[in-house]
């Protein structure tokens, strides 16, 4: 026998900012709530029909004559009228029983709604907290990397000036290099702190997600059990009330006997599973741990730790013009000048990152606000509709809105 599948193992999403699995489960519970209402409406209308039918039978029996008949036929006719009245009364009683079942289902549905709302509130809180801290961590990372680049540039400038510059220029350059280094150190501290906070919230969200999945599976189990039993009881009530229709209701019972709650849950999970693993933690990336590949085999030139540069303007999909990328693509190596042999310079390879063209253009919606940082970027407001022209692998997408083109972060968009 296969082990019972669990919601908590099958509704994850690798995208750190997406909550697809939770949304699928929540929709399942909402669909189940609608099913409860449909069952309630069925019982309500059947109770009304049984009540009308019972009252009409009682009225027919009481108005029937037969007083002119005598002896055994009179007794038989009187018995028929009495039994017809009894049948009518039993149908009226059945209507009352169906209304009791209806009230029980309504109370069950409301209890499940209250329980679901509690878990929804908790999940909304942790999801918003996770997304907020993720955005903060990414901004801290961006600032940290920029400060590191500034510190490297200032250090290189100081080394050049110290070789043949004036004393004041050397001191000024040295002070600037020291300030840039301090700024980079502070940015690194903020970045580490942001990652630590994000990991704490991520762990809390993951635990809440598991707990919510377990609660939702229990609710689904209870709902299926209650509805299955309600169908069973309703079928038995109608079967006992109308023996002549027993064959039809027997078919219902045979069908209900083949109903398996476990099989229903397994089938749903297999059809709608969104993944078996939660998103991986966001790692801390040290700026100076990146691999630098020298493009020259000259033994006189060694790689300099911390001399890494990022030429974002030469990459397709980054917020720079493609003409700059084309003109810079031919420059593959940077070599030190002969008169600077006493300095240490590292040749840096530049790879051209190809973008994924979105052909034909597709419409996307902005999820968050974004303020352009460069002239070739576009401002975004949550809810804006845009056409994606090019999807850059570095995360910057070329979009068009109202005749204007520019770059925006791809993670801020969702496909319509």
Curated annotation (Swiss-Prot):
Keywords: Cell adhesion, Cell membrane, Cell projection, Coiled coil, Cytoplasm, Cytoskeleton, Disease variant, Endocytosis, Immunity, Inflammatory response, Innate immunity, Membrane, Phosphoprotein, SH3 domain
BP GO annotations: cell adhesion; endocytosis; inflammatory response; innate immune response; signal transduction
Effect on the protein of changing residue 257 to K: In AICZC; uncertain significance
PTM entry text: Dephosphorylated on Tyr-345 by PTPN18, this event negatively regulates the association of PSTPIP1 with SH2 domain-containing proteins as tyrosine kinase. Phosphorylation of Tyr-345 is probably required for subsequent phosphorylation at other tyrosine residues. Phosphorylation is induced by activation of the EGFR and PDGFR in a ABL1 dependent manner. The phosphorylation regulates the interaction with WAS and with MEFV.
Tissue: Highly expressed in the peripheral blood leukocytes, granulocytes and monocytes, namely in T-cells and natural killer cells, and in spleen. Weakly expressed in the thymus, small intestine, lung and placenta.
Pfam families per the UniProt record, alphabetical: FCH, SH3_1
Residue span(s) of domain SH3: 359-416
Residue positions where Phosphotyrosine is found in the record: 345
One GO term describing the cellular component: cytoplasm
Keyword Glycoprotein in record: no
Location, primary (coarse class): cytoplasm
Topological type in the membrane: Peripheral membrane protein
Annotated coiled-coil segments of the chain: 166-212
Cross-referenced InterPro entries: AH/BAR_dom_sf (IPR027267), F_BAR (IPR031160), FCH_dom (IPR001060), PSTPIP1_SH3 (IPR030777), SH3-like_dom_sf (IPR036028), SH3_domain (IPR001452)
Alphabetized CDD domains for the sequence: SH3_PSTPIP1 (cd11824)
Disorder association: Pyogenic sterile arthritis, pyoderma gangrenosum, and acne: A rare autosomal dominant autoinflammatory disease that typically presents with recurrent sterile, erosive arthritis in childhood, occurring spontaneously or after minor trauma, occasionally resulting in significant joint destruction. By puberty, joint symptoms tend to subside and cutaneous symptoms increase. Cutaneous manifestations include pathergy, frequently with abscesses at the sites of injections, severe cystic acne, and recurrent nonhealing sterile ulcers, often diagnosed as pyoderma gangrenosum. Autoinflammatory syndrome with cytopenia, hyperzincemia, and hypercalprotectinemia: An autosomal dominant, autoinflammatory disorder characterized by severe systemic and cutaneous inflammation, hepatosplenomegaly, arthritis, pancytopenia, failure to thrive, and marked elevation of zinc and calprotectin blood levels. AICZC shows intrafamilial variable expressivity and incomplete penetrance.
Function: Involved in regulation of the actin cytoskeleton. May regulate WAS actin-bundling activity. Bridges the interaction between ABL1 and PTPN18 leading to ABL1 dephosphorylation. May play a role as a scaffold protein between PTPN12 and WAS and allow PTPN12 to dephosphorylate WAS. Has the potential to physically couple CD2 and CD2AP to WAS. Acts downstream of CD2 and CD2AP to recruit WAS to the T-cell:APC contact site so as to promote the actin polymerization required for synapse induction during T-cell activation. Down-regulates CD2-stimulated adhesion through the coupling of PTPN12 to CD2.
UniProt note: domains: The F-BAR domain is important for filament formation. The SH3 domain is not required for filament formation or localization to the uropod.
Assembly mode: Homodimer. Homotrimer. Interacts (via coiled-coil domain) with CD2AP, PTPN12 and PTPN18. Interacts (via SH3 domain) with ABL1 and WAS. Interacts (via SH3 and coiled-coil domains) with MEFV (via B-box zinc finger); the interaction allows binding of MEFV to PYCARD and facilitates formation of PYCARD pyroptosomes. Interacts with CD2, DNM2 and FASLG.
Protein name: Proline-serine-threonine phosphatase-interacting protein 1
Organism this protein belongs to: Homo sapiens (Human)
